[in-house]
């Protein structure tokens, strides 16, 4: 990270800036308003010291690092806290006061003595009394006019002072010291013109103490002659005389002197001898056009003195951009060596008009006459506001920035590239008659529209066609209008309302008032400001609690986007767009989005044009990030400090970055890929911008500009961070982790943390398995193994691993596993098998793959093991079973952070045709109820299996830990209605404190009212004692299942046990289970917006048509659920609500049976299409772009108005098919491999074909609905049809007698085998057609290899 400062506008006094060298480090200090700015460590370390009023002069003692600072009539002395420069900091040690006149100048000598100029010239010594510093006045003298400038020699023997416009310099010679008093003699040094500058020739501190016989004084006056005076002792007489002159040419405007000690320190001895300047001082005479003359002066340090000689060393030319060409005055602080950088000089230029520039000069280039060009690189630029910045307003494109203050000081700034990072350049100043309240910046900063505190609406022109360093920075007020003062309402936000096509001549601006009303204006610099018609915000009677402008973060101009976001007191959030109709002079406001966040009394809200929103809760310490496009919460975090500011930006790919501002620092967060498998957060802090080490002032405002530049305003200072990263930042280090990034910047890192995944990434493989692409995953794992093996053999770095593994992209788009082309690889690894699995796992334990963290690589090994296990069971487990086994494997590898398998995994098992096999694969792990709860067996295993597992668990719970406690297994035996076994166990529980009481009590008959009442009383007593499980047992003892499951659900908080007890006690689909699901589980599901759980609930309630709809629809929008839960309570607290796997299960179920299919017809095509696009966006956010393309390419939309569908819906036989589905246990669950798809039955292309079925083709599902009445149908024709056709899926839906009749007529094939089944399936695949082929709006054609496949959504989007 490169953090540059604009510490504040320097004050316009000659001694406002000072540069010195202390302990071989360059220190720079200057005055800005009432602040002292100190920069150290190569100008990277900043300290800001605040004073009572504006500062006038500052000087640094190069001997001990003390800093003297004057303001008004006082001088403050600051000492360094540490004597080492790693973390330099200064603190006040004493204060000086002489008289009431303002202090104009001050200078240190080496012996901690100080000369101060006001109306008096005074001389002070700062005495150290064991760490307590005491200022002692040693001499003072009233001056005829205020002292304008004063300098003191290093040995404190000579002081020179002048007044403003003086032609005579006063030289004060120290002649004696009596006690703590000093005596000075005066010598006048006449000049022909007013003196403009003067300085003493300096030596290193250790030399100056030993050699005090001779001093050289430089003076410059308006006659443009540099005079060198020599002050020396001769025969005990003090002598001062002119020792030489250096005239300046008419074009030369300034003079810079480099003392010989600086040359010796920065140049090697060899270079000094080569250029013959080892004993010379250098004088640089420069013009405002960048032309420089470099001279060497000799014999200035000789004792006894010799006549001065001078020679021209070189002539140089520097770029005008680094100098000033329009200023009248220049102040050049002393040149110093640049820290320990050999051959570099630190050169400062103060223009006395608000800017100090820091340049680096190569001294070898300066004295070398072989080249004319001199590179003077602009390292830093020190400017800013004079008073505190109130607000930062950026242009919509991020190219310009407006800063406002509490006064009339406002400025337009542009980013400026420096050698080390980015700074800001002041382009224009705007002086308004009243402080700016709101503003909008247009045309790359060339136009500013602002509303002032006094109600004036103004448009300013800010010219930019000037020279870069021009001091003509004023702006021009072009048009103005006054708003009528409203007493009841007031403007709360001002914004730009873009037209569909951008116009440079006019702009539309809107003012939103506190009641939601809006005033819109057309603003033209040439024609004026005109009010146009505007709608009010549709806020439905709600108050606007908080409102903010949405940050425009797109890389290009976008007009059709939300412009404002607002939130009510109860947390209802809305965003609005504006549509500008220029012809009608009308601005229309449309609600773009509305979500209920549930965050009441929020303190801050800020949105992004990419559809993100950040909200801070009422405490100011909880930040939540929302996706407005999907209406879900993506991230939430709680901080220790209150949040003050929020700002958004994005990469060119639309990946969001948000800054969360606090009082002294800002945290930068980037979005991450969605991870639905590991439940990792979707945002990550990647950098911390901390200014507390540089200033004690709080952050006032912050804003993002283009190209990842982040600007912070604090007081009158700016802190500018470019896009580069600080690799020592712990947040940055953690976010990069073990990844290798190509570019060290925040935008690139955000793209790496998002973007497409390599195809060997575990998340990609997991989502591919969910998308029914098991064969693709196997090939990818085999290719990964072969690629790593090849890299190992060829001794190549693993970073050369192809992220796509050389896979043909078309293979990702194959819809069904059975259509996947089998590719044979060379021996000894022709396909993925156990050998490959073990070898690949071993490789991954030794090799770190690119773009994968350690945790992700562990997950990849888990996926490999799961695929290996699935491969063994592939022929006996259907695909939902495969998905379930993968979920179990992932759960086992994440048990430390995951309590149980997910409801997604439960749904896979629930809709699998092989529940017994799935149970057997995990049965050995399920011993206790805790283990059973981990696998959520109460939700999905069959009733008879659950009864058996309850018996096993009851036995284990009784005997575990060798305590033989019947109370632990009581709930299970009573659910099994085996009270006698429980009684026997109590009789065996010798030593249990409650044995005798329980044996006597349980022995009673609880069908008798007396004992039933006694048991109920005991249950309530146990509830009052918080013995909830025992209370549930006593409720169940009295046959009060409802009270029992209520206790288990509400007090024990074990929904799994409640469901299990219901299913075992009253059988599947009993009334108590139905009430439990609807009264207890459903309301929470609606609040959590859990679609997996909602689908399960409706499946258990025998509402398949609603269960399939629940996969795509929010639970509150199903049936009459809006009356169960208030919509305001429903908050999408997680981005996981729209799992892409929901869509995969939906597609599977609508192919499963008729009731699911008819239920899917209730989902509108528009909703289905929208959901497809949203899931596609989610998959891309997950990094699974190939799978997103495959989903869009292969999805089939049902044409709801097609003839087959309409006749199906109108058929009376449909209702009989509905009624034939009884309890859930009787749901048709024959394996998909053995049963043709439901959609195979809709293969007739026309109505005539439907009414006249071809007897040679298999019997169609619709034949049973569309045939003539039963009395006109002969049994012979039925037998003939049945004998040649495969068994219809409707046999399981129609009446039992009809099914039995068909079974009798259909010949049975002897000795069925798996191989024959597979052959039968292959034959059926050739004949059968998917129902979606006929119900979709267009039949998809098999893509040719050379042609581009048409996207199915072309007809819908």
From Swiss-Prot:
It is found in: Endomembrane system. The keyword Coiled coil does not apply. GO terms for cellular component: cytoplasm; endomembrane system; membrane; RAVE complex. Residues 1272-1288 have a biased composition (Low complexity). WD repeats lie at residues 98-134, 142-182, 190-239, 384-423, 431-470, 595-636, 638-679, 898-939. It comes from the Eukaryota. The modification Phosphoserine is found at residues 1244, 1248. Residues 1320-1332 have a biased composition (Basic and acidic residues). GO terms for biological process: early endosome to late endosome transport; protein transport; regulation of protein-containing complex assembly; vacuolar acidification; vacuolar proton-transporting V-type ATPase complex assembly. Keywords: Membrane, Phosphoprotein, Protein transport, Repeat, Transport, WD repeat. InterPro entries: DmX-like/RAVE_component, Rav1p_C, WD40/YVTN_repeat-like_dom_sf, WD40_repeat_dom_sf, WD40_rpt. Residues 1243-1357 are annotated as: Disordered. Present with 149 molecules/cell in log phase SD medium. Component of the RAVE complex composed of RAV1, RAV2 and CBF3D/SKP1. Within the complex, it interacts directly with RAV2 and CBF3D. Interacts with the V-ATPase V1 subunits VMA1, VMA2 and VMA8. Component of the RAVE complex, which is required for stable assembly of the vacuolar ATPase complex V-ATPase under many conditions. Required for transport between the early endosome and the late endosome/prevacuolar compartment (PVC), suggesting that assembly of vacuolar ATPase at the early endosome is required for transport from the early endosome to the PVC. This is Regulator of V-ATPase in vacuolar membrane protein 1. It comes from Saccharomyces cerevisiae (strain ATCC 204508 / S288c). The lineage of its organism: Eukaryota, Fungi, Dikarya, Ascomycota, Saccharomycotina.
């Amino acid at each position: 990270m490169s953090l540059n400062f604009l510490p504040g506008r320097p004050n316009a006094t000659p001694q406002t800036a000072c540069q010195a060298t202390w302990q071989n480090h360059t220190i720079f200090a200057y005055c800005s308003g009432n602040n002292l700015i100190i920069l150290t460590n190569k100008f990277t370390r900043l300290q800001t010291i605040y004073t009572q009023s504006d500062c006038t002069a500052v000087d640094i003692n190069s001997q001990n690092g003390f800093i003297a600072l004057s303001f008004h009539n006082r001088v403050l002395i600051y000492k360094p806290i540490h004597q080492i420069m790693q973390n330099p900091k200064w603190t006040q040690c004493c204060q000086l006061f002489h008289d009431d006149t303002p202090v104009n100048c001050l200078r240190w000598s080496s012996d901690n003595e100080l000369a101060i100029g006001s109306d008096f010239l005074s001389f002070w010594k700062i005495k150290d009394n064991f760490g307590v510093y005491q200022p002692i006045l040693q001499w003072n003298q009233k001056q005829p006019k205020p002292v304008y400038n004063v300098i003191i020699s290093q040995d404190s023997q000579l002081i020179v002072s002048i007044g403003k416009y003086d032609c005579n310099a006063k030289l004060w010679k120290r002649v004696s010291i009596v006690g703590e008093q000093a005596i000075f003699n005066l010598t006048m040094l006449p000049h022909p013109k007013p003196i403009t500058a003067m300085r003493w020739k300096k030596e290193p501190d250790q030399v100056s103490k030993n050699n005090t016989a001779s001093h050289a004084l430089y003076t410059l006056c308006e006659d443009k002659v540099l005079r060198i005076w020599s002050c020396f002792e001769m025969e005990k007489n003090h002598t001062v005389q002119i020792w030489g002159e250096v005239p300046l040419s008419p074009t030369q405007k300034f003079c810079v002197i480099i003392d010989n000690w600086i040359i010796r320190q920065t140049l090697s001895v060899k270079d000094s001898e080569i250029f013959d300047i080892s004993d010379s001082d250098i004088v640089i005479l420069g013009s405002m056009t960048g032309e420089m003359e470099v001279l060497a002066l000799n014999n200035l340090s000789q004792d006894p003195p010799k006549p001065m000689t001078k020679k021209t060393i070189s002539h140089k030319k520097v770029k005008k951009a680094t100098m000033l060409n329009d200023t009248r005055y220049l102040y050049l602080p002393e040149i110093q060596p640049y820290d320990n950088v050999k051959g570099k000089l630190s050169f400062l230029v103060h223009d006395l008009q608000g800017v100090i520039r820091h340049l680096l000069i190569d001294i070898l280039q300066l004295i070398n006459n072989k080249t004319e060009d001199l590179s003077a690189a602009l390292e830093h630029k020190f400017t800013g506001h004079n008073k505190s910045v109130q607000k930062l307003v950026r242009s919509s494109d991020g190219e310009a920035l407006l800063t406002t203050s509490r006064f009339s000081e406002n400025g337009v700034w542009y980013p400026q590239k420096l050698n080390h990072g980015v700074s800001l350049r002041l382009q224009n100043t705007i002086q308004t008659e009243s402080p700016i309240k709101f503003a909008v910046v247009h045309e790359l900063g060339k136009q500013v529209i602002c509303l002032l505190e006094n109600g004036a609406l103004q448009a300013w022109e800010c010219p930019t066609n000037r020279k870069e360093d021009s001091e003509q920075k004023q702006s021009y007020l072009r048009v103005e209008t006054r708003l009528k003062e409203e007493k009841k309402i007031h403007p709360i936000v001002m914004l730009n309302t873009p037209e569909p096509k951008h116009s440079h001549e006019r702009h539309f601006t809107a003012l939103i008032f506190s009641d939601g009303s809006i005033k819109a204006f057309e603003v033209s610099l040439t024609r004026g400001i005109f009010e146009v018609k505007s709608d009010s915000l549709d806020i439905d009677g709600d108050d606007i609690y908080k409102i903010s402008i949405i940050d425009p973060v797109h890389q290009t101009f976008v007009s059709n986007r939300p412009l404002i976001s607002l939130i009510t007191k109860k947390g209802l959030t809305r965003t609005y767009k504006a549509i500008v109709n220029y012809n009608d002079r009308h601005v229309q406001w449309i609600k773009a989005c509305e979500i209920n966040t549930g965050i009441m009394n929020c303190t801050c809200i800020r949105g992004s044009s990419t559809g993100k929103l950040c909200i801070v809760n009422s405490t100011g310490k909880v930040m939540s990030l929302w996706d407005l496009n999907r209406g879900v919460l993506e991230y939430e975090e709680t901080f220790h400090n209150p949040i003050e500011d929020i700002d958004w930006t994005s990469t060119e790919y639309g990946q969001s970055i948000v800054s969360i501002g606090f009082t002294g620092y800002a945290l930068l967060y980037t979005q991450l890929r969605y991870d639905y498998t590991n439940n990792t957060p979707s945002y990550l802090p990647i950098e911390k911008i901390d200014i507390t080490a540089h200033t004690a002032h709080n952050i006032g405002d912050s804003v993002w500009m283009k190209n990842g530049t982040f600007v912070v305003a604090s007081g009158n200072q700016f802190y500018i961070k470019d896009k580069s990263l600080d690799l020592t930042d712990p947040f940055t280090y953690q976010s990069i982790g073990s990844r290798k990034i190509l570019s060290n910047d925040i935008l690139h890192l955000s793209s790496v943390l998002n973007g497409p995944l390599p195809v060997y990434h575990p998340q990609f493989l997991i989502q591919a398995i969910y998308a029914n692409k098991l064969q693709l995953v196997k090939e990818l794992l085999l290719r990964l193994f072969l690629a790593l093996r090849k890299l190992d053999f060829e001794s190549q770095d693993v970073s050369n691993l192809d992220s796509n593994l050389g896979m043909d992209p078309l293979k990702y788009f194959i819809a069904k596993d059975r259509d996947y082309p089998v590719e044979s690889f060379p021996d000894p690894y022709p396909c993925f098998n156990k050998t490959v699995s073990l070898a690949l796992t071993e490789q991954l334990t030794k090799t770190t793959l690119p773009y994968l963290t350690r945790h992700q690589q562990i997950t990849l090994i888990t996926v490999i093991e799961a695929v290996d296990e699935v491969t063994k069971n592939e022929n006996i487990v259907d695909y939902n079973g495969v998905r379930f086994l993968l979920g179990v494997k992932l759960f086992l590898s994440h048990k430390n952070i995951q309590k149980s398998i997910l409801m997604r995994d439960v749904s896979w098992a629930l809709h699998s045709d092989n529940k017994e096999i799935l149970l057997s694969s995990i049965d050995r792990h399920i011993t206790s109820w805790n283990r059973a709860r981990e696998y959520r067996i109460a939700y999905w295993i069959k009733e008879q299996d659950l009864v058996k597992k309850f018996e096993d668990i009851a036995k284990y719970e009784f005997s575990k830990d060798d305590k033989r406690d019947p109370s632990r297994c009581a709930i299970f035996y009573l659910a099994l209605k085996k009270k006698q076994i429980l009684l026997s166990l109590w009789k065996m529980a010798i030593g249990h404190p409650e044995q005798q009481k329980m044996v006597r009590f349980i022995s009673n008959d609880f069908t008798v009212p007396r004992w039933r009442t006694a048991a109920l009383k005991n249950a309530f007593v146990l509830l009052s004692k918080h013995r909830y499980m025992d209370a549930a047992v006593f409720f169940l003892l009295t046959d009060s299942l409802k009270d029992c499951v209520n206790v288990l659900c509400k007090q024990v908080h074990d929904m799994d046990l409640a469901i299990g007890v219901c299913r075992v006690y009253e059988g599947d689909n009993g009334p108590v289970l139905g009430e439990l699901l609807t009264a207890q589980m459903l309301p929470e599901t609606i609040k959590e917006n859990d679609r997996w759980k909602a689908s399960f609930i409706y499946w258990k309630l025998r509402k398949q048509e609603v269960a399939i709809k629940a996969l795509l629809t929010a639970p509150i929008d199903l049936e009459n659920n809006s009356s169960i839960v208030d919509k305001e309570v429903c908050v999408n607290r997680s981005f996981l609500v729209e799992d892409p796997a929901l869509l995969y299960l939906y597609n599977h179920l609508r192919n499963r049976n008729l009731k699911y299919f008819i239920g899917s017809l209730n989902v509108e095509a528009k909703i289905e299409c929208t959901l497809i696009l949203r899931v596609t966006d989610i998959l891309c956010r997950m990094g699974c772009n190939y799978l997103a393309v495959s989903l869009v390419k292969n999805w089939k939309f049902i044409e709801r108005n097609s003839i087959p569908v309409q006749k199906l819906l109108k058929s009376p036989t449909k209702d009989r098919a509905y009624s034939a589905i009884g309890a859930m246990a009787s749901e048709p669950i024959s394996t998909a491999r053995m049963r043709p798809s439901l959609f195979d039955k809709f293969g007739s292309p026309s109505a005539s074909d439907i009414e006249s079925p071809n007897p040679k083709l298999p019997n169609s599902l619709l034949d049973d609905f569309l045939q003539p009445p039963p009395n006109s149908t002969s049994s012979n024709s039925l037998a003939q049809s049945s004998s040649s056709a495969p068994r219809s899926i409707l046999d399981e839906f129609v009446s039992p007698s009809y099914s039995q009749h068909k079974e009798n007529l259909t010949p049975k094939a002897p000795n069925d085998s798996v191989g024959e089944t597979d052959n039968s399936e292959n034959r059926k695949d050739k004949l059968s057609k998917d129902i979606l082929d006929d119900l979709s709006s267009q039949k998809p054609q098999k893509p040719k290899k050379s042609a581009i496949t048409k996207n199915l959504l072309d007809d819908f989007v």
